[in-house]
Amino acid sequence: MTDLPPADAPVDPELDAAEIEGDESQSEAGGPDESTWRRFDVTSEAGEGLAAAQAAIAAGECIVLPTDTVYGIGSDAFSAASVQRLLDAKERGRDMPPPVLVAEVGMFEALADEIPSHAMRLAQAYWPGALTLIVQAQPHLRMDLGETRGTIAVRVPDHDFTRDLLRRTGPLAVSSANVSGKPSSTNIDDAVGQLGNRVQVYLDGGATPGETPSTIIDFVSTSLGKVVRQGALSLELIHEVAPFVEGIESPEESATLADASEPAGTDPVEAASDAPDEGVDA
């Protein structure tokens, strides 16, 4: 991979907010008109891609980024307008709030309130990785992700480029890079085809491992933990670290549990791991 510039490197001055905003048509349903978005290969154009993505996030725009599960669409988690832009791009309501991706466990501790011991053990064991943890958010946290009811879903992705980006931008609200009800994107062309000029910067990391999303564990309804979506991290591995986490017996139960609890990032439709055509969070 091309050497990455230091995390405190200045943003390219040519990528100012006025240029990033581009055509207002990006806020409407639009096709992949490349005049309003830019694409970067994260291997051969790592530095340029990081700078462009950082500038887009700072300007309140959306980006598409690779993860270790599926491609995600991301925006500034601390900007309500940016999160709404993400939801609009996905044609998704505020009742389906996106999870938050962070670069390291320390940021999880900063965002969450009184993390249960089992949750912290899982984070330390399986992050970076395909595990999303739902916990109570800090009461004074200035995030408006949607109807979270005081919860937050957090993950550290196992993708070097994306974690480096997160160190520069801070926490990002990230959902799967697809229109709700459409297949998840496992390559950048899938994402471009669905989201087009609703996104300012596309970061091409090649094909993802597949359509299986992260496993989601709810630590709000019980401090011991309950799986509300079975994804890439198996229950067997979870039980090696936290043996009392409650599993699920079927994808149908996964959707039912998510519907009943509805904490951040567990949309009842998008939670079902056997229904990739409904779209799933990264």
For each predicted feature, which ranges?
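Active-site-adjacent structural elements in enzyme catalytic cores
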Residues: 2-282
